[in-house]
Amino acid sequence: GLGSDSSGIMILLEDAPIGMPLKEYLGVNDVVFELEITPNRPDCLSHIGIARELGAYYNKEVNYPSTEINGETGEKTEDNIKVEIENSNLSKRYVARIIKNVTVKESPAWLKERVESIGIRSINNIVDASNFVMMEMNQPNHTFDFDKIAAGKISVRSAKENEKLVTLDEEERELTTDDIVISDT
């Protein structure tokens, strides 16, 4: 990708061939569609949703990604972490899954390019994979560091009066009681 700073001049390496198209020099070989989805079609707010719609329009079968879980350990997630939905009007379902032996690091180039092409800032391999799956399946999700989850519990609840949080972009945001919070406290 081109990065998020578009405020100035892009400095290329000295060996950049003069006259070569920028997309060729950068190795950008992708098409990005900008779609306007009407409010009555939230099913089209994901890659799979758009694929289904195009498949129906062109009478083509959609190849869905596998949702099979590999590497079962026999250890049950619910034995290690509890999920509590404080009000089922907020969320009908929230599930947890523990994945062990993961190293947080910079995303590989292909993943960075994919998340940035859909307007999401690359953060690291874990957050980027989570965000990409969210956009692929239109399924909100979040990743937690298991070792940092307080009391082994995740709660789905309404925000508290005057509750604040610091988001991944290091901005402090004030919540309202209408906001849904996924919390370990």
Task: Describe the predicted segments one by one.
Residues G1-T185:
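RNA/tRNA-interacting regions in translation and RNA-turnover enzymes
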